[in-house]
């Protein structure tokens, strides 16, 4: 009897991580089942940022639905506008002018750098390195300025639209992007100097959150999470859209599938994006930036000041929208976080019948349980950082 009393009763400890935890990157509520300091189970509770985007889109016409895509993953805005615009264009069957395609690709790669700078530097901040975070935001500020000059908004640009882009690049912007691209390589080097061979950084990332190639495919991972496990799948190469098939770039691939591999891939992807930006600036042709179809493209501001017909045309287009032929399409782009897909169904009216959004972060968050099992609490923070999760797109 006394022996039984002395036997220590083991009981797992349940802890709430978030939703107001600084390392949760938004509104993640994570219920952790702990054995001491080791994680037995991680149960993510999502939906705290659910806004009913997919339903709201059904009440808007095709052009009015576009700004919702900026607000999903609010770190990589134009990549999502791109997916939606491509989907609408596929249903309309329209061919986008070459210049518009180059501008789109240029800004999608600027968006990729914006996203990866945020991902790598906030990941470092979570692990305890403050300096790269401050450097990264200095560079992001310059890129945000390019967004602002081209669209008028720093974040929610609504710049890439079905049929092309909303307006041409202003004078001098190409030169400034070129100047940025020339100096940004050395900024990446600085971040790498501080992190890549740093002993503490490697101790916190190497062999943490390992994902095998089979697991990555089974859980539906995409983007960096898939390439980190050794699978060279990038939609820009495998299913090229716009002018990606005319540009040269490499796909960085990991070997071990741990947090460190994914960090290295993000850094290398920033370098590849620089390469693509340079090619876009060099190859960009002159010409129009919208489809020459008056049913889809609004008239220019200059025409609206001169012509009453143009003003009426603009008003009708923005209030009633345009009808899209009956059909359905699934269109995906390689967003910075992974495969961002739009399943769009048209019933022939001016509003989408259904718009299903496939967000990459949703699949990645599902894998948090198996990735953090057997690791310490501190490593959960590292794993959330490496998954690069933004809740706007997870909860939608």
Swiss-Prot record:
Localization: Mitochondrion
Keywords, alphabetical: Electron transport, Mitochondrion, NAD, Oxidoreductase, Respiratory chain, Translocase, Transport, Ubiquinone
EC number assigned by the record: 7.1.1.2
Gene3D superfamilies in alphabetical order: Cytochrome-c3 Hydrogenase, chain B
UniProt GO molecular function: NAD binding; NADH dehydrogenase (ubiquinone) activity; quinone binding
GO CC, any one term: mitochondrion
Function: Core subunit of the mitochondrial membrane respiratory chain NADH dehydrogenase (Complex I) that is believed to belong to the minimal assembly required for catalysis. Complex I functions in the transfer of electrons from NADH to the respiratory chain. The immediate electron acceptor for the enzyme is believed to be ubiquinone. Component of the iron-sulfur (IP) fragment of the enzyme. Component of the iron-sulfur (IP) fragment of the enzyme.
Name under which the protein is recorded: NADH-ubiquinone oxidoreductase 49 kDa subunit
Organism name: Reclinomonas americana
């Amino acid at each position: 009897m006394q022996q039984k009393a002395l036997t220590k009763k083991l009981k797992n400890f349940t802890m709430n991580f978030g939703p107001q935890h600084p390392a949760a990157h938004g509104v993640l509520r994570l219920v952790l089942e702990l054995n001491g300091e080791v994680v037995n189970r991680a149960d993510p509770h999502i939906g705290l940022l659910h806004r009913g985007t997919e339903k709201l889109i059904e009440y808007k016409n095709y052009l009015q639905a576009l700004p919702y895509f900026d607000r999903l993953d609010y770190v990589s805005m134009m990549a999502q506008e791109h997916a939606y615009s491509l989907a609408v264009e596929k249903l309309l069957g329209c061919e986008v002018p070459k210049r518009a395609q180059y501008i789109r690709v240029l800004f999608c790669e600027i968006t990729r750098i914006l996203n990866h700078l945020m991902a790598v530097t906030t990941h470092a901040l979570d692990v305890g390195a403050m300096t790269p975070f401050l450097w990264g935001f200095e560079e992001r500020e310059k890129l945000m300025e390019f967004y602002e000059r081209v669209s008028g908004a720093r974040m929610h640009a609504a710049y890439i639209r079905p049929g092309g882009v909303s307006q041409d690049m202003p004078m001098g912007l190409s030169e400034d992007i070129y100047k940025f691209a020339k100096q940004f390589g050395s900024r990446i080097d600085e971040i790498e100097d501080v992190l890549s061979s740093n002993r503490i950084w490697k101790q916190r990332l190497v062999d943490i959150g390992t994902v095998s190639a089979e697991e990555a495919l089974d859980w539906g991972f995409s983007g960096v999470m898939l390439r980190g496990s050794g699978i060279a799948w990038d939609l820009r190469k495998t299913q090229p859209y716009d002018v990606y098939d005319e540009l040269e770039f490499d796909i960085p691939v990991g070997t071990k599938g741990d947090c460190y591999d994914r960090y290295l891939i993000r850094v290398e992807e920033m370098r590849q994006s620089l390469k693509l930006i340079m090619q876009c600036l060099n190859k960009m042709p002159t010409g129009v930036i919208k489809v020459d179809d008056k049913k889809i493209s609004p008239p220019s501001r200059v025409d609206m000041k001169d012509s009453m017909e143009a003003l009426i045309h603009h008003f009708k287009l923005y209030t009633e929208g345009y009808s899209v032929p009956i059909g359905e399409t699934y269109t995906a782009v390689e967003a910075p976080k992974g495969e961002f897909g739009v399943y769009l169904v048209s019933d022939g009216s001016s509003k989408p019948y259904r718009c299903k959004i496939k967000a990459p972060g949703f699949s990645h968050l599902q894998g948090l349980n198996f990735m953090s099992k057997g690791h310490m609490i501190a490593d959960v923070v590292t794993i959330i950082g490496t998954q690069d999760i933004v809740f706007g797109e997870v909860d939608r």
